[in-house]
Amino acid sequence: MTPAPAAASYRALVALLLVAVAVADDGSTLLEIKKSFRNVDNVLYDWAGGDYCSWRGVLCDNVTFAVAALNLSGLNLGGEISPAVGRLKGIVSIDLKSNGLSGQIPDEIGDCSSLKTLDLSFNSLDGDIPFSVSKLKHIESLILKNNQLIGVIPSTLSQLPNLKILDLAQNKLSGEIPRLIYWNEVLQYLGLRGNNLEGSISPDICQLTGLWYFDVKNNSLTGPIPETIGNCTSFQVLDLSYNKLSGSIPFNIGFLQVATLSLQGNMFTGPIPSVIGLMQALAVLDLSYNQLSGPIPSILGNLTYTEKLYMQGNKLTGPIPPELGNMSTLHYLELNDNQLSGFIPPEFGKLTGLFDLNLANNNFEGPIPDNISSCVNLNSFNAYGNRLNGTIPPSLHKLESMTYLNLSSNFLSGSIPIELSRINNLDTLDLSCNMITGPIPSTIGSLEHLLRLNLSNNGLVGFIPAEIGNLRSIMEIDMSNNHLGGLIPQELGMLQNLMLLNLKNNNITGDVSSLMNCFSLNILNVSYNNLAGVVPTDNNFSRFSPDSFLGNPGLCGYWLGSSCRSSGHQQKPLISKAAILGIAVGGLVILLMILVAVCRPHSPPVFKDVSVSKPVSNVPPKLVILHMNLSLLVYEDIMTMTENLSEKYIIGYGASSTVYKCVSKNRKPVAVKKLYAHYPQSFKEFETELETVGSIKHRNLVSLQGYSLSPVGNLLFYDYMENGSLWDVLHEGPTKKKKLDWETRLRIALGAAQGLAYLHHDCSPRIIHRDVKSKNILLDKDYEAHLTDFGIAKSLCVSKTHTSTYVMGTIGYIDPEYARTSRLNEKSDVYSYGIVLLELLTGKKPVDNECNLHHLILSKTANNAVMETVDPDIADTCKDLGEVKKVFQLALLCTKRQPSDRPTMHEVVRVLDCLVRPDPPPKSAQQLAMPQRPAVPSYINEYVSLRGTSVLSCANSSCTSDAELFLKFGEVISQNTE
């Protein structure tokens, strides 16, 4: 018989041997799992041999050395999940989210008997949820959202005694919600939105005594809300929106103390229960797009913590209770598309935090209250389609943050207040279909960020002001059905972004030649005016139908069906004999004056003394050369090589210029920028600024090579960039769009940041760019970024601030603080740069179809879904999506609402420099031909110890790391970004 100590030793030895065998098996299991993945070479390169506990994403138990956790999230892995995963008996956590995995979830996953967390979200997994999942008795968190899973939700999930989080959102699941799942005593989070679930909401829902989050949005659930809903006292978020639920909203729903109650997009009828006014914890109340009727309960004014109140798209009647003015934290109030009546309550003036007010399509009457101007943070005001009367309050100019103002389809009268032109940030102004009279104020031209202007169907008189030509961002102008006269201003031809122009049914005279340079114009209607002359057939006019010109008997052109005859026997003389005699006498006098001037001796004019008010000289404009790249060219050469700046050499348009490509033998191409306006008034002042700009040299700035200024035209000469602008690469059509991999995007971001950092911190004088955008980031043949158009920016003054006379920049990129105050500093550029980062990350435009990219990212961030917006080209080429998240974080830091919360461009460079991988030394001719990483500017040298391929390596530095920078500026990927 074996002695007891010997037996104990024997059992211990056997246990150790079993552990050793298990450990060895875990290593081989991981290698088998790797075989089922694709795109592993660059991310799982260390999964080859040796100590697997040191492999990427692997965490082992400190005692047994068995695999305890596997985290391969965000690595862009393809392929499938191997059934071998079931052999990891000791694994506690599996995180494979945000990859490109496909296929089915293997049944063997149920053999991971120790598993507590399983996260397979944001992949392309399909098939059913395996019933074997119900074997995971220790599972606490099961997250399978954002896949392609089908079938029913297994009722056996109710047998998981420790399940706290179940998130199956955004799949293709069908059937009913298993009733047994409502009896899970520990379940806290149930996310089922975005599936095809049917059936009703069970009365057993309140058996989930620990449940605080219940989201079934975007399904096909039917029936009423259970009367027992008031017993779900632990609920904090209840989202039943966009289903087919019906019946009335139960009275006892008011017993809930939820922060979010979303019932929109259903078929609820009846009145809004007054008891909802007792739900003091409500931050979001959304009852929109139902069939609710009756008045708005005045008791809702008690909801002093509510930030968003949505009631649009119902059948609500009666007046707006003035008590709503007590909702002191309200940001969004949407009451549009109802049958509300009465006056707009002046108490709304107390809602100083209101951001969006929508009262459209109701029956409101009376004047617009002056108190609205007290809503100083109001960004959007829509009162379209009511019965409002009186005049437009001039006090609206106090709404400095306003971007959208729509007062159309009312009975407003009087003139357009000139004060509206002081709302600097306005991008949409719609006053159409009213009874407004008087002229269009010329000051409207100061709304330089306006995208849409609609003044149609009023009683406006006078001329179209020439100042309209200052609206360089404008895309749509509608002045139809008024009494406007005069000519179409020549300045309209400077609107390079104009896509729609409607001037029909007015009394406009003259011709249409001024519109020939509106190259973006797609829709033109000048019908039923008094226009005359030839309709051009070149440029963009060939795209317009004859209907665009109807009702103008004086217009002619072969494709309009009327020939342009210079004279005829039957025609009346166009001018009188007396006028002809006067013209002849005047011409003779002018001829005599010219002869006297020619015969009189004079000295040749000196170019630099020419001013705009002096006559144009016959001497060719002088070409001022700032760098040797232009040393062999003269003005005549450039005109010859571009055939006097012929259209066929045009490579781009800007808000203030047209750009041509000038190519000659044995020289690098040159970009010639022709400014639209002959500004500034003082050539000497402008020359001084250009010479200062020409002296600025940096590898990430486009060099100004020379210039030519004269009353006949102002030309600037720059280095030519082979790959155009970043805008072109990201946003042009499919035929032109170039796919950018992640590394290239990172290097573009770093290069642009280095150029901007040089302007802000190392340039003398230091410069604010004022218009940072993807169109002003040019790419050379190696896709290295070069910042352009910094040349006409003002130098930073000693106080580091500057008050401009008008807001500069481009819609979508403008710092909201700058737009509100017109006070400019370096942080305004940082904000714009952050928007460019978002473009690089998403491939989306800053503003597209009225969708604001920054607002989109903020909303996705609030839902922890920001990675859904990543450009697919990044997902295909990025080795570590964690880097993408860090750049998202950096972009949101740069776009913080408070300028003081944003980093400097030096700090931005340091963060990006940690993410960009240094190029290895070239080993072949092919490698030598590849673009090399830009040299780091001198101001980075002090941070050389920060070099590394990840934030972790940077954070180990004794210097300030990017991780510490993130801490310094606050947590960004949260709901409190702004």
Swiss-Prot record:
Using the record's annotation, list all stretches that form the Protein kinase domain: 645-916
Give, as one word, the top-level EC class. transferase
Q: Which residues lie on this side of the membrane: Extracellular?
A: 25-577
GO cellular-component terms in the record? membrane; plasma membrane
Pfam families attached here? Answer: LRR_1 (PF00560), LRR_8 (PF13855), LRRNT_2 (PF08263), Pkinase (PF00069)
Q: Name the positions where ATP binds.
A: I651, G652, Y653, G654, A655, S656, S657, T658, V659, K673
Q: Mind telling me what this protein is named?
A: LRR receptor-like serine/threonine-protein kinase ER1
Q: What is the lineage of its organism?
A: Eukaryota, Viridiplantae, Streptophyta, Embryophyta, Tracheophyta
Q: In the UniProt record, what gene is named as encoding this protein? A: ER1
